[in-house]
Amino acid sequence: MLRRLEEFAGRDLYVTGCMPLVQMDEIRSVCNPRVIHPDEIQERSGSIGTRGPGATGVVQVASGCAGRCSYCITRLARGRLRSAPAEAVLDAVRGLLASGAYEIQVTGQDVAAWGLDRGESFPDLLRGISGIPGRFAVRVGMMHPASVTGILDDLVEAFHSEKVFRFLHLPVQSGSDTVLERMQRGYTAADVIRIVDAFREEFPDMMISSDFITGFPGETDEEFQETLELLRRCEFVKVNVTRYSRRPGTPAAALKDLPERLRKERSRALLAEANRIYDRYNERWMGRVTPVVATEKNVPGSTVCRNPCYLNVVIRDDLPPGFSGRALITGNHRHYVIGELV
């Protein structure tokens, strides 16, 4: 990111997000941007809800984090968990629906932790959102496995609403208990399996995505194999793989890095396995007819739609945002499938 900022050093730059809160000296060494504090964005807009492209709307239900991961700079930048009041969230959703949104994306650094600082729980908030009258669907954002374990049964129950996409983003980071301990993630591989099995038992076609970090300091070949095994066991779809890089001021920054070559090799191996799982997941939809809703435009002559499991279905037709119908799935392009209206 610093290299990218340096490339644009001669232009008017605005920098926001977590980075300027903890790396301002480094930023000033390569450019002289105007800085907008993340909280200032909401203050200026006056709402925690924002319209996205097409028929999407985004609601940030919380900022900060309740975790203490040894490698993460977000906690240092954003501070402890701060949950938005439930009524503010519901008002934001109502406003987005009134503006024409269909897909409501509920976001935060850890959505499952919402309410811990207020004596409330996220499943109750999710039920409140899905109880709002209207035609829409909620995409629940990233949830830390440690936060999910304490609300698992109630969370699964809340996902039974037809207004909630059968989609879960569970950032696992590693499948090795010893690496997870060094990361200070607060859960084990067995906890992850329990979460995945609980959801898949209720929703067999559920899309569960994840994030992994390869080459964390001290990661052995055996520990990396444990990560591959967890990926295969849980069949995560849409996996984001990141090579570990140290963040200043974090406990892990003091640990000795693995060679970059090894981090790259493990990243490629993990991504290759994830892509095979992605293809298998898409293949299970081939020849099936599924409900779809148009959420955003693609290139001219095609439209991006979502099915109840948040499958990315491209219809080769110009459809208005919010259009609903049924589609026969005919083609697999890994990151999306092709559908034909029936």
What are these regions (language model features)?
Residues 54-87:
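Canonical Radical SAM [4Fe-4S] cluster-binding loop centered on the CxxxCxxC motif
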Residues 246, 254-342:
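Terminal RNA-binding accessory module
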Residues 33-59:
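N-terminal [4Fe-4S]-dependent radical SAM core
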Residues 1-38:
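Cofactor-cradling patches in redox/metallo enzymes
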Residues 222-267:
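C-terminal, non-catalytic macromolecule-binding modules
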Residues 14-16, 22, 98-221:
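Conserved SAM/AdoMet-binding glycine-rich loop
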Residues 76-105:
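Conserved alpha-helical substructure of the radical SAM core
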Residues 89, 106, 140, 170, ...:
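Conserved, mostly hydrophobic/aromatic
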